[in-house]
Structures are given as structure tokens and as C-alpha cells.
Curated annotation (Swiss-Prot):
This is Small ribosomal subunit protein uS12. The keyword tRNA-binding applies. Part of the 30S ribosomal subunit. Contacts proteins S8 and S17. May interact with IF1 in the 30S initiation complex. It comes from the Bacteria. The modification 3-methylthioaspartic acid is found at D89. One of its GO terms (molecular function) is structural constituent of ribosome. The gene is rpsL.
Length: 124
């Protein structure tokens, strides 16, 4: 336990909280341009070809973003919206692309969980 005198000389340091998504700069989403669209493999024990893209954001950051859902229409120079949220089995991927916003189309033939994949309500 520190004495009063010690605390007067050197107060207790506030704990600094480190952001999991520094490139967003405290914004909910950010816009960016795809510089590379490719697939990568996850860590053990999983196995797949995960779709990801490198995105140059409007604030100058370049980040790797995951493209969720089955199939996508992204290519180089596509303008995308990115949100936070890491992909546990892809090291270094801390962002998700928002489906159905800007140049990124929603997922085709999606009936459930539509809001997460940018799909309008089907006509029925």
C-alpha cells in the first residue's frame, strides 16, 4: 500500500484501454477501396479457403477485411464499407466487409439471417 506522500509525488496511473480495431478510429464503420481480393487458409484445426481483401481506408490505413457469406462480387478498386469484428481462425484479420453496402452486393438466395448479409425481404 502506497503512503499519501508517495501518491502525492506520483499518482496512480490510469489503465489505458487498447482498441481491437484501431483503423476505425472510434467510428462504427469506414469506407475504403479494395487493393487486393484473395483467399487464404485458416489456422489449425480448421480447413477452408476464406475470402478476404486488402482495403485502403479513407484515413490512409491499409487493413485486411473478411468477406462473409457465400459468393461475392468484389474485385480490385471496389469501394467497400468495413466494420470491426475479427475472424478467430484468420490471424491478422480484424475487420469485416459490410454486405449490401456500396459496391459489395448482398448474398444471393439468402432467406434467414438476411440483415447480416444485406438481403432485402423476399416477395411472397
Amino acid at each position: 500500500m502506497a503512503t499519501i506522500n508517495q501518491l502525492v509525488r506520483k499518482p496512480r496511473a490510469k489503465q489505458v484501454v487498447k482498441s481491437n480495431v484501431p483503423a476505425l478510429e472510434a467510428c462504427p464503420q469506414k469506407r475504403g477501396v479494395c487493393t487486393r481480393v484473395y483467399t487464404t487458409t485458416p489456422k489449425k484445426p480448421n480447413s477452408a479457403l476464406r475470402k478476404v481483401c486488402r482495403v485502403r481506408l479513407t484515413n490512409g490505413f491499409e487493413v485486411t477485411s473478411y468477406i462473409g457469406g457465400e459468393g461475392h462480387n468484389l474485385q480490385e478498386h471496389s469501394v467497400v464499407l468495413i466494420r470491426g469484428g475479427r475472424v478467430k481462425d484468420l490471424p491478422g484479420v480484424r475487420y469485416h466487409t459490410v454486405r449490401g453496402a456500396l459496391d459489395c452486393a448482398g448474398v444471393n438466395n439468402r432467406k434467414q439471417g438476411r440483415s447480416k448479409y444485406g438481403v432485402k425481404r423476399p416477395k411472397s
